[in-house]
Structure formats: structure tokens, C-alpha cells
Amino acid sequence: MRLMGLDIGDRRIGVALTDENGVAAYPLEVLERTSPEKDLRRITEIIDQYGVERVVAGLPKTLSGQIGPQGDKVLSFLDKLRVRSTVPVITWDERLTTAEVEKLLVSADLGRRRRRKVVDKLAATLILNSYLNSRKSGRNT
């Protein structure tokens, strides 16, 4: 089962995929946000092109576990995606994911401009890997 991971931000959407067996996640691309319609069109194109069977979208939460304004924006976007696609869309806690990737890229001495180009798709990969690891350990289906 091929899965898609999404890291949805105000300016960019990071996209990651798994292999056909749903075992290994890899970064695919970063979508520069233009309009909800174009963003949704591109995501559904990727779903169709790669035969994605489930979308795992990062849901930003506060450190206390509450859904804040950014989380509400993500949920609204995902509602629109669910209308356009028959593929199941689930959310996954993404607390500190982008910060974790940023820290890793800084330690790898990657410049700010290059980090900006990859951070979102790497965050999507981290979200997807977290989901895959939880499935392997039996914490999620």
C-alpha cells in the first residue's frame, strides 16, 4: 500500500511517498502554495500518478496537545481534499517535526536558502516515517 505524507504550511506543502509496499518513506517534492484549488489539483495528480492509497497529513498541535489556528487551517484544507479524492486522509501529530528537521539541516551545515528548499518535504517524510513506525509497533492501523 503506497502512502503519501503531507506537511501543510501557509507557504509550502511538503510531499513524501512510500514505496509500493508502504515500507520506506522518501521525500518527493515541495509545492509552493498558490491557491487552494491549484494545491488540491496537484496533490490529487500525485495521488493518481503514484497510486496512493492513503494520505497521512501532519496536524500541528500545541505542546499541550491542543489544536491551534494553524491546525484549524490544516483541517480545513484536508476537508477539501477529502471532497476531491476517494483516498482516506488521516492526520498525524506533527509537533516539532519541522523544528527537528531544521536542527538536523543546520547541523549538516546546509545554508538557509538550501534548507528552505528541502525542509518541508523532509518534514513530510518524518511525519510519514513516524506513522509507519507506529504501524510496525502495532500502535496504529
UniProtKB/Swiss-Prot annotation:
UniProt EC number: 3.1.-.-
Cellular-component GO terms for this entry: cytosol
Protein name: Putative pre-16S rRNA nuclease
The keyword Plastid is assigned to this record: no
UniProt record similarity statement: Belongs to the YqgF nuclease family.
GO biological process, one term: rRNA 5'-end processing
Alphabetic keyword roster: Cytoplasm, Hydrolase, Nuclease, Ribosome biogenesis
Taxon lineage: Bacteria, Bacillati, Bacillota, Clostridia, Thermoanaerobacterales
Function (record text): Could be a nuclease involved in processing of the 5'-end of pre-16S rRNA.
Subcellular location, record wording: Cytoplasm
Matching SUPFAM superfamilies: Ribonuclease H-like (SSF53098)
MF terms (GO), sorted A to Z: nuclease activity
Primary residence: cytoplasm
Lineage top rank: taxon: Bacteria
Enzyme class: hydrolase
A Pfam match: RuvX
Residues forming coiled coils: none
